[in-house]
Structure formats: structure tokens, C-alpha cells
UniProtKB/Swiss-Prot annotation:
Organism this protein belongs to: Paraburkholderia phymatum (strain DSM 17167 / CIP 108236 / LMG 21445 / STM815)
Pfam families reported for this sequence: Ribosomal_L5, Ribosomal_L5_C
SUPFAM superfamilies with a match to the protein in the record: RL5-like
PROSITE patterns membership: RIBOSOMAL_L5
Protein name: Large ribosomal subunit protein uL5
An individual GO BP term: translation
Top-rank taxon: Bacteria
Entry keyword set: Ribonucleoprotein, Ribosomal protein, RNA-binding, rRNA-binding, tRNA-binding
Transmembrane spans: none
InterPro entries according to UniProt: Ribosomal_uL5, Ribosomal_uL5_bac-type, Ribosomal_uL5_C, Ribosomal_uL5_CS, Ribosomal_uL5_dom_sf, Ribosomal_uL5_N
Amino acid sequence: MARLQEFYKEKVVPGLIEKFGYKSVMEVPRITKITLNMGLGEAVADKKIIENAVGDLTKIAGQKPVITKARKAIAGFKIRQGYPIGAMVTLRGQAMYEFLDRFVTVALPRVRDFRGVSGRAFDGRGNYNIGVKEQIIFPEIDYDKIDALRGLNISITTTAKTDDEAKALLASFKFPFRN
């Protein structure tokens, strides 16, 4: 069992029950999945970009991402239907907790001029989105072997009903919020 998973069961659940007054353990919000998405609009010109991005995302997530394709053609962006335009990986279970642990304890402190993550990036339904500008904050990525700095979107999906519950859940996982 992952370190954060044990921490969730032993410390987070009792803390949230006390804070929000849940009657059942099953009411306590939990993280269901973490989705990593890398948009690669520049991949239209060069197919090697997709391979490099898939390699980076595989190292970061620990599992192979799926290549996302364009749903419809957009002439202004020189994209045809079916063109590969990104890579996405969904983490659940133990891999999800291990990624979250590495992200909070190792990757976020490596961000340049890091002052904490925004507390306003919730979607109104208890899910949290964070954008990472460079993939080199992850220790799995070797700085000398990358061809370009690429950002990625990290979407944390929870069972929380409100943003306050989700923020309390992530804060109990030692998420470094600004305010």
C-alpha cells in the first residue's frame, strides 16, 4: 500500500469526519483519479515530438499514455481530423497515490519561484486542476535528454461535493496552497 494511501486511512479520514461531521466513512471525500494531459499542437509539423512527449509522460506517470487525436479538422491550426495532438494518462489506485506523493513532496518544491498552488483552481464540483509549465520539475526527467520544455495539465478528480471539501481533502494531503 502506498504511503499516502495509509496516511489517508489513518489521518485524513478521521480529520475530515471531525471537520465536516460526516455520519459514515463512505461520505468522506477521496481522490478517485489523477489525469495528466499534455497538449502538443506543434506535433503537426514534426512526428518526433509525439514520441518524445510520450516518453516523458511515461517516465513521469509510470505507465504508457494514450495519444489523443483531433476530433475535427481546424484549418486555422492546420489540423486534420485524426491528427495526433496530445498525450494523456489516467492514474488510479496505488499508482495515483504514489504519483501524488512524488508530486507534492518532490516536484512542486522544484518549481522556480514557487509560492504555493492557487486555491481557486477548483471547478465547482470538487475537482482540482493545476498546470505545470515545464516537465523538468519531475526528478524522473533528465534535463540533458529533453528536446523542448513542455507543460502539462494535472487534473485531480475527487468525490467531494463542494470545493471546500475538496480543498480540505487536498490540504490534509499537505498540498501547499497559497492562502
